[in-house]
Amino acid sequence: MNIHEYQAKAVLQPFGVSLSKGVAILKATDAEAAAKQLGGPIWVVKSQIHAGGRGKGKFKEASAGDKGGVRLAKSIEEVKQYAAEMLGATLVTIQTGPAGKQVNRLYIEDGSDIEKEFYLSLLVDRVTSRISFVVSTEGGMNIEDVAHDTPEKIISFSVDPATGIMGHHGRTVAKALGLTGDLAKQAERLVAQLYAAFISKDMEMLEINPLVVTKQGELKCLDAKMSFDGNALYRHPDISALRDETEEDAKEIEASKYDLNYVTLDGTIGCMVNGAGLAMATMDIIKLYGMTPANFLDVGGGANKEKVTAAFKIITADPNVKGILINIFGGIMKCDIIAEGVVAAVKDVGLKVPLVVRLEGTNVEAGKKIIQESGLNVLSADDLDDAAQKIVKAVKEAA
């Protein structure tokens, strides 16, 4: 689960992390009061969306102006102007895709007198089963570009969970960033604070970009990006309460209600598969035959008729879907259950696009019989290769 920047900073505050003061607003009419509360004389008006690259992003609407999603204001009037322009407008960044995201919240923050910018993040390293720090002197930039162009400027290390964070970890960060004296001590404290927050809240990722040194000699987190382990949210009702469903895909939200693993993609062939590995293989073979998947959907091994019906409805709710491929290998999941769910869903919502079903495994003959006797216009496939070719051909012919 992701949260907004202003929420992430609120999570970090109790751990003693050095942050700028800020006020979140939902209405442009609240901008003046927020600016006066902070005092100025410089403010930063930040779009709050679940995507990076806000500063370099562009708004779709001409009324939002030609500046990005993070703007420096030198007067209260500018704060009011930017708030009016940005709220409700659609911001397109390198991470949102061409559709962009609507800005429904702003974070108005005290401006900082910046001397240097750095990058610092913590993430779960699944190879070592440890938390890793990633540090770079190239802050305020897209870290993927830095990793590609100048990998030598990125330093990373992991923390042994048996010992936890230790003094040498902070010194490693300070050395990597070229910090000495009091700034090095601040870096040591910050590393311990961020690690404590990461562990305490079951985070998957914590990114500070940029981490800055101000001209007053203070090490400060100017931005904060967080994601949390969804499997641990039951332990953190305070974090769960921060969820902003307007930032999430409506189909993914609906899928989560049925414990379906669903991810929206930008293709045209909807997929329903059991098992993540088989789902990825199905997506790959669709791509191999010249088309792209519209989603990743793993119904899991214990799906029932209602769950399958819900999955089918979610797929058909996507207007980009021009064909559907159902690929089931019945182990724990029984093919007749899948067939019953598909037939029920088709009769309920109708079938306006080609549908190919490949069933194999437990109760496969019963499953095929249910589909055959349903009278539905469904293409049957014997194996994955056959299924992929049939759905691609059917979609092209229907176009």
Curated annotation (Swiss-Prot):
Q: Which domain of life is it from?
A: Bacteria
What start-end ranges are recorded for coiled-coil regions in this protein? none
- A GO term, aspect molecular function: ATP binding
Top enzyme class, one word, equals ligase
> Which amino acid positions bind substrate, per UniProt?
274, 331-333
Gene Ontology cellular component terms for the protein in this record = cytosol; succinate-CoA ligase complex
> What cofactors does this protein use?
Mg(2+)
Q: Which keywords has UniProt assigned to this entry?
A: ATP-binding, Ligase, Magnesium, Metal-binding, Nucleotide-binding, Tricarboxylic acid cycle
Q: Which InterPro entries match?
A: ATP-grasp_succ-CoA_synth-type (IPR013650), ATP_grasp_subdomain_1 (IPR013815), SUCC_ACL_C (IPR005811), Succ_CoA_ligase-like_bsu (IPR005809), Succinyl-CoA_synth-like (IPR016102)
Keyword Nucleotide-binding assigned: yes
Q: Which residues bind Mg(2+)?
A: 209, 223
Q: Which residues bind ATP?
A: 46, 53-55, 109, 112, 117
Pfam families per UniProt: ATP-grasp_2, Ligase_CoA
Details of cofactor binding? Binds 1 Mg(2+) ion per subunit.
GO biological process annotation, one example: succinyl-CoA metabolic process
Role, per record: Succinyl-CoA synthetase functions in the citric acid cycle (TCA), coupling the hydrolysis of succinyl-CoA to the synthesis of either ATP or GTP and thus represents the only step of substrate-level phosphorylation in the TCA. The beta subunit provides nucleotide specificity of the enzyme and binds the substrate succinate, while the binding sites for coenzyme A and phosphate are found in the alpha subunit.
Assembly behavior: Heterotetramer of two alpha and two beta subunits.
**Which HAMAP family does the UniProt entry name for this protein?**
Succ_CoA_beta
Task: Identify its protein family.
Answer: Belongs to the succinate/malate CoA ligase beta subunit family.
NCBIfam families, alphabetized? PRK00696.1, sucCoAbeta
This one is known as: Succinate--CoA ligase [ADP-forming] subunit beta
Species assigned in the record: Rhodopseudomonas palustris (strain BisB18)
